[in-house]
Regions:
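N-proximal low-complexity "stem/linker" segments adjacent to membrane-targeting elements
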Residues: 1-38
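Short beta-strand/loop segment that forms part of the nucleotide-sugar
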Residues: 45-55, 77-79
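Hydrophobic helical membrane-anchoring modules
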Residues: 1-14, 157-158, 181-260
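A conserved acidic beta->alpha catalytic loop
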Residues: 53-62, 108
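Acidic helix N-cap motif at the loop->helix transition within catalytic regions
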Residues: 27-31, 58-67
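Acceptor/aglycone-binding surface of glycosyltransferases and processive sugar-polymer synthases
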Residues: 75-95, 100, 109-186, 207-232, ...
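Donor nucleotide-sugar binding loop of glycosyltransferases
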Residues: 25-28, 56, 85, 111
Length: 260
């Protein structure tokens, strides 16, 4: 862990966008904003909450419009149709203009207040990923998640214990280089590692679902992650990193910049 003065100096230069994918969550959005406001009152860095409406067909979009009109720290973008969680996350990453990017679901099964402990591990680590402790889910949901995580770790050996945990913060420089593909959201930690980044994993609290129903079933919790894992293995085999050793760029006034 970095020394406190170093961390304080680092955080003084940082800003955070918290991505919140939304798909038919009208029943939980009001309480979610209440919980997020508690975090905004304590966050050590300037923070924007960015809702990504993934083609909701209920009243979610109307609620997001009202929230963002009333609260200056809240923004939203709305996809023209439902594209899935990976696309919603990638759209949020592309839209963010901060140095750090967080992620949380809007179903209030995790609390944004746990983000506060994540900041302790920057800048030493490039991503902090939660691990849901004492999961408050059905037996089928918990077992399918255990199976999927075990198979994924066996096939790609990334060491990420709970890749589906909806509580993460990562440096934007790494998030920007993450490609969009089916199931991308399941491999955020592994994709940071592919870039040479480091991932810290922390236990976080987990709660019963506040309202509504889960958008996943046994098919997309077990079989689809397996298929996506083989897709990730192919991407990993073709992955390339690079570093710029020197650059020369013309400035607007005609000056030049050269450096290493």
């Amino acid at each position: 862990m970095p020394a406190a003065p170093d961390r304080a100096a680092y955080l003084a230069t940082q800003s955070l966008t918290v991505l919140v994918p939304v798909y038919n969550e009208e029943e939980s959005l009001g309480q979610f904003v209440v919980e997020m406001d508690k975090f905004l009152a304590e966050t050590p860095v300037p923070t924007t909450v960015l809702f990504v409406n993934d083609g909701s067909t209920d009243g979610s979009l109307a609620i997001l419009r009202d929230v963002c009109r009333q609260k200056p720290n809240y923004e939203f973008i709305s996809l023209s149709q439902n594209r899935g969680l990976s696309t919603a996350v990638k759209a949020g990453i592309d839209h963010a203009r901060t140095t750090l990017i967080g992620y949380i679901d809007s179903d209030i099964q995790t609390t944004p207040l746990d983000f506060l402990t994540f900041f302790e591990f920057f800048p030493k680590y490039d991503m902090v990923n939660g691990i849901r402790a004492k999961r408050q889910d059905t037996f089928v949901k918990k077992m399918s998640s255990v199976i999927a995580n075990t198979v994924r770790r066996t096939l790609i050996n990334d060491g990420i214990q709970d890749t589906g945990c909806p509580l993460k913060i990562l440096k934007t420089e790494y998030a920007r280089r993450i490609p969009l593909f089916h199931g991308m959201h399941r491999f955020l930690g592994a994709l940071v590692q592919l870039q040479g980044g480091t991932v810290k994993q922390l236990p976080v609290r987990h709660f019963p679902r506040f309202a509504g129903t889960a958008k996943y079933n046994l098919w997309n919790r077990a079989w689809k992650p397996l298929v996506d894992t083989f897709g990730f293995r192919w991407i990993r085999s073709r992955w390339k990193n690079y570093e710029i050793g020197e650059a020369h760029r013309q400035q607007a006034a005609g000056a030049t910049t050269t450096g290493k």
